[in-house]
């Protein structure tokens, strides 16, 4: 059996924790196009303030690099790059496309490639695969293994950390390859959940965050209503919580890289089938309006 040589592409909030988990067992290449990020990591400095110096110390032959030639020896690639929205809230895949173009230049027979970035269903099996097939070594889609594993990291959350969050993994491969995949990802998460279809794994990620966004939007809507009717929102929720199946979510601003973005990925995916996700978009509209609502409340109090 070939020695597993992982490469994590993208060393941000998602990729760096994966790198740190894997370097305990493997010689890992941590690759990022941002030279300043690499320079800081080499001197054991994490600008995101998620990890301490001891966490970033490297043993054996693991490295941080921004040079694509350093990933040529790798055979297990994990892509964890941002997928921000473009103008008009359309999905933006430029970092994913760039990462897969980089891999296509070094891909070899029997390589395993995983996408962890949040994308709309079909991205892995169609868009990413198409890029890989343009490789210079003329490797066919029968000679490499492409999969998807959604990231679930919650930055700053010490309770729900990378190791104890279950990890969904999907790849079109035989049991031998799946065992190899588990061998790698078991160093990241204690519980691996296998999905039979890559598209279903991709969609599940969008739903996780969209559900939370919608639940918060409902609380925001009720809070606005209570304000207009001069009712105590906290008292209303306290009373509602006395029912056993009431789910408590807090109102407020919804930010970050995921919750304000993923509903639009879901909506875009649905629109390809000429279906409009009305509830999803309504929730986004409410949450987007909260900035003005809260600002106006503060101004009135001044």
Residue ranges and their predicted role:
Residues 2-5, 27-29, 33-76, 81-91, ...:
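Conserved N-terminal Rossmann-fold NAD(P) cofactor-binding segment
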Residues 3, 216, 223, 227-302:
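NAD(P)-dependent Rossmann-like dehydrogenase/reductase catalytic/cofactor-binding core
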Residues 130-149, 153-245, 269-273:
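Internal alpha-helical scaffold of NAD(P)-dependent oxidoreductase catalytic cores
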Residues 15-16:
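N-terminal Rossmann-fold NAD(P) dinucleotide-binding loop
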Residues 85-152:
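Rossmann-like NAD(P)(H) cofactor-binding subdomain of soluble oxidoreductases
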Residues 81-83, 118, 173:
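Short glycine-/small-residue-rich Rossmann-like dinucleotide-binding loops
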Residues 9-12:
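Glycine-rich Rossmann-fold phosphate-binding loop(s) that bind the pyrophosphate
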Residues 21-22:
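Aromatic pocket-lining residues of Rossmann-like dinucleotide-binding sites
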């Amino acid at each position: 059996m070939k020695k597993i040589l992982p490469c994590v592409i993208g060393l941000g909030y998602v990729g760096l924790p994966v790198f740190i988990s894997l370097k305990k067992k493997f010689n890992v290449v941590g690759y990022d196009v941002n030279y300043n990020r690499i320079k800081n990591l080499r001197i054991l400095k994490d600008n995101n303030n998620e990890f301490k110096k001891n966490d970033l110390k490297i043993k054996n032959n693991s490295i941080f690099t921004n040079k694509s030639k350093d990933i040529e020896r790798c055979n297990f690639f994990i892509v964890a790059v941002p997928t921000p929205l473009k103008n008009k809230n359309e999905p933006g895949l430029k970092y994913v496309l760039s990462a897969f173009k980089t891999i296509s230049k070094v891909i070899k027979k029997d390589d395993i490639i995983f996408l962890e970035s949040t994308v709309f269903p079909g991205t892995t099996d169609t868009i990413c695969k198409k890029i890989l097939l343009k490789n210079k070594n003329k490797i066919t889609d029968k000679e490499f293994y492409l999969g998807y594993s959604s990231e679930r990291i919650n930055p700053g959350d010490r309770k729900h950390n990378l190791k104890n969050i279950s990890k969904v993994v999907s790849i079109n491969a035989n049991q031998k390859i799946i065992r190899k995949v588990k061998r790698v990802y078991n160093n990241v998460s204690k519980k691996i959940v296998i999905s039979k279809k890559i598209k279903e794994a991709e969609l599940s990620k969008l739903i996780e965050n969209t559900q939370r966004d919608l639940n918060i939007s409902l609380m925001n809507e009720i809070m606005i209503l209570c304000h207009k009717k001069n009712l105590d929102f906290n008292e209303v929720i306290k009373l509602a919580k006395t029912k056993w199946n009431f789910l408590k979510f807090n109102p407020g601003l919804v930010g970050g890289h995921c919750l304000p973005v993923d509903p639009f990925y879901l909506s875009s995916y649905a629109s390809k089938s000429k279906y409009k996700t009305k509830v999803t978009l309504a929730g986004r509209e409410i949450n987007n309006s909260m900035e003005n609502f809260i600002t106006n409340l503060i101004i009135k109090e001044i």
